[in-house]
Amino acid sequence: MTDVARILKEARDQGRMTALDYANQLFDDFMELHGDRHFADDGAVVGGIGYLDDIAVTMVGIQKGSHLQDNLFRNFGQPHPEGYRKALRLMKQAEKFGRPIITFINTAGAYPGVGAEERGQGEAIARNLFEMSDLKVPIIAIIIGEGGSGGALALAVADQVWMLENAIYAVLSPEGFASILWKDGSRATEAAELMKITAKELKRMTVIDRIIPERGYFSSEIVEMIKEHLKTEINQLRSLPLEELLENRYQRFRNF
């Protein structure tokens, strides 16, 4: 098995820590909040407020299930438009109260069903991109598993984007890429090699800012590592003048 094939397999492993796992281990007094105030509460998107030591933060994440029934409830981590609208509601609330935003991303992509499209899936994603680019609080996005397409980017317009060592981030799935390029989805590993989807490759291309190592560490050690990095970077971002924070975020994405 090639290194890319191994990473692809690990990124999709059902046993990986979820967004709620990270929230409950990183933040004190974490309280989950629900609903988009328009249509429904999407189980694929979770969010709430808590304390990173003494820093009040807002957390938003895409949640995959840990077993079949949970996956059905979470729609296998594929958000509907109401999920993205819930995320935006919580992020605008964070801006109102001056709370830094931390997002955890693990999705193959936004849900492509008829109902989701009828309720404005494309608009919901585009609205998040537009609004996040100008939110007046620090934003850090962490890709903890799969980072698939616009469904992932809708929570990743951030001042810094981090990836776990065995996560992936791509415009579409390797299977989808292989199906388009060669009409053969079984060539997914070959496609993944071409797509440059691993943390190491994306860091080299400056698409992401930090890699969180996994190999040789227990999950509790990874959480502690993330916590220390978050405290350092949030304090640094909060020290910037607002104009500089927003300009840096803008230039980060313009440079692509």
From Swiss-Prot:
Ranges of residues in domain CoA carboxyltransferase C-terminal: 1-236
Q: Extract one GO cellular component term from the record.
A: acetyl-CoA carboxylase complex
Reactions catalysed according to its record:
N(6)-carboxybiotinyl-L-lysyl-[protein] + acetyl-CoA = N(6)-biotinyl-L-lysyl-[protein] + malonyl-CoA
Q: Residue span of the signal peptide, if any?
A: none
What start-end ranges are recorded for coiled-coil regions in this protein? none
User: What family does the entry list?
Assistant: Belongs to the AccA family.
For this entry, the protein name equals: Acetyl-coenzyme A carboxylase carboxyl transferase subunit alpha
Gene3D superfamilies recorded for this chain?
2-enoyl-CoA Hydratase, Chain A, domain 1
The reply on keyword DNA-binding is no
Any one Pfam family match given in the protein's UniProt record, by short name: ACCA
**UniProt-listed Enzyme Commission number(s):** 2.1.3.15
**What job does this protein perform?**
Component of the acetyl coenzyme A carboxylase (ACC) complex. First, biotin carboxylase catalyzes the carboxylation of biotin on its carrier protein (BCCP) and then the CO(2) group is transferred by the carboxyltransferase to acetyl-CoA to form malonyl-CoA.
> Subunit structure of this entry?
Acetyl-CoA carboxylase is a heterohexamer composed of biotin carboxyl carrier protein (AccB), biotin carboxylase (AccC) and two subunits each of ACCase subunit alpha (AccA) and ACCase subunit beta (AccD).
Q: What class of enzyme is it?
A: transferase
The pathway this protein participates in, as annotated, is:
Lipid metabolism; malonyl-CoA biosynthesis; malonyl-CoA from acetyl-CoA: step 1/1
A GO biological process held by the record: malonyl-CoA biosynthetic process
Cellular compartments annotated: Cytoplasm
GO MF annotation, one:
carboxyl- or carbamoyltransferase activity
